[in-house]
């Protein structure tokens, strides 16, 4: 399934899936096992319409005056960014709230606003010069992709083996 973190966690709790891949942060529960597998970074990207901001160091307050493109509110990524910005005294009202990060990148490519996405979603466009990342005077803290499973539910043998392999890979990657 391809769903926001809260929805994926519900599927897991209800036994509809053996495991899921979600992004932090999310509420920890004793019955949910979490295996961090990859670090992720949130960035703000823009196209030529916002070229005057390229290579400038901005304050997060500037976001309040820009047309923003965010994920919908029912995602952990959106909640994380809203909380991070609020912690810095910044409150935004996005022009567009979209279902996927791929859609955000496409809206940004068409110069409809400044998008907030995980770096990987915009990497190819940034490397090709079609988009650029806004720079800020403070870093946005990194997050994690995690594999999660419900320890109170039985798991299919194939899913169990895949999780074992992922745990080994994650352990090797941190050595």
What are these regions (language model features)?
Residues 12-13, 63, 106-112, 147:
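Hydrophobic residues within well-ordered alpha-helices
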Residues 86-96:
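A local structural motif
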Residues 1-29, 98:
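Central regulatory/effector-binding core of bacterial HTH transcription factors
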Residues 31-68:
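Flexible hinge/capping segments at coil-to-helix
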Residues 132-174:
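A late-sequence structural motif
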Residues 52-54, 67-88, 155-159, 163, ...:
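Secondary-structure junction motif
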Residues 33-43, 128-141:
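Short beta-strand->loop
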Residues 24-30, 83, 87, 102-133:
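A ligand-binding cleft/hinge motif common to bilobed small-molecule-binding domains
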């Amino acid at each position: 399934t391809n769903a926001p973190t809260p929805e994926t966690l519900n599927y897991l709790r209800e036994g509809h899936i053996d495991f899921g891949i979600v992004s932090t942060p999310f509420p920890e529960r004793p019955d949910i096992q979490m295996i961090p597998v990859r670090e992720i970074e949130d960035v703000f990207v823009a196209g030529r319409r916002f070229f005057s901001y390229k290579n400038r160091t901005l304050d997060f307050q500037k976001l309040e005056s820009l047309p923003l493109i965010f994920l919908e509110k029912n995602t952990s990524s959106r909640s994380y960014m809203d909380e991070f910005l609020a912690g810095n005294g910044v409150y935004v009202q996005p022009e567009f709230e979209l279902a996927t990060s791929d859609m955000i990148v496409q809206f940004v490519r068409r110069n409809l606003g400044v998008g907030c996405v995980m770096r990987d979603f915009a990497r190819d466009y940034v490397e090709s010069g079609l988009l650029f990342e806004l720079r800020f005077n403070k870093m946005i803290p990194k997050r994690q992709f995690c594999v999660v499973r419900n320890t109170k539910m039985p798991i299919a043998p194939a899913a169990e083996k895949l999780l074992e392999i992922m745990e080994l890979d994650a352990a090797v990657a941190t050595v």
